[in-house]
């Protein structure tokens, strides 16, 4: 089982990740980390609150990238939004993460969930309007079942990671 991190607090999440107890973590829902912080700072004037929010989120991503073992997979679940150009992206707060960082660009795998014909699916590759991406040989089709265990097994198989459950 993955360790599900569902607490909207960067310090707690980063502490849990640094403990290195598990081979997989699920952060659900990462977008709420930004949204809750925005609400906490709603009475602050100016752009500093947006800068703080972006830096806290970027620090979380840096912790994931630099402070978890190579064979540890952190699944970041987030909401999406459509831009004014019709493209789909991870929903963020403010412009700093979008304009200076582009969150999706930090990851080698980005899947998007959707519902069709009474089934939930993941899209594994972009059609030019979504941020979806994965190594071409990782999945057999452009759409797969919305099954995180299947995804985890495919990633571990592709990269040669231990499939050990913890």
Predicted features and spans:
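Conserved GTP-binding G-domain of TRAFAC-class P-loop NTPases and closely related GTPase folds
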Residues: 83-166
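Hydrophobic, Leu/Ile/Phe/Ala-enriched alpha-helical segments that form helix-helix packing faces
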Residues: 17, 64-68, 107
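Residues that form generic nucleotide/phosphate-binding pockets
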Residues: 16, 67, 154, 158
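Phosphate-binding glycine-rich loops and adjacent basic patches that engage nucleotide phosphates
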Residues: 20-31, 114-120
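Intrinsically disordered, low-complexity regions
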Residues: 10, 42-44, 152
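P-loop NTPase motor core
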Residues: 24-102
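Basic, amphipathic N-terminal segments that precede the first structured/catalytic domain
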Residues: 1-24, 142-149, 162-166
């Amino acid at each position: 089982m993955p360790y599900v991190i569902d607490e909207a607090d960067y310090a707690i999440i980063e502490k849990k990740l640094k403990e290195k107890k598990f081979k997989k973590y699920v952060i659900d829902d990462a977008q709420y980390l930004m949204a809750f912080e925005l609400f906490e700072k709603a009475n602050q004037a100016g752009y500093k609150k947006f800068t703080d929010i972006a830096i806290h989120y970027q620090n979380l991503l840096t912790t994931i990238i630099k402070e978890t073992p190579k064979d540890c997979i952190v699944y970041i679940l987030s909401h999406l939004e459509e831009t004014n150009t019709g493209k789909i992206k991870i929903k963020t707060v403010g412009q700093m993460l979008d304009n200076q960082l582009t969150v999706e660009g930090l990851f080698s795998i980005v899947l998007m969930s959707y519902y069709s014909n009474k089934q939930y699916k993941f899209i594994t590759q972009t059609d030019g309007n979504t941020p979806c991406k994965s190594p071409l040989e990782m999945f057999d089709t452009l759409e797969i079942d919305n099954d995180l265990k299947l995804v985890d097994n495919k990633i571990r198989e592709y990269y040669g990671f231990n499939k050990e459950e913890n």
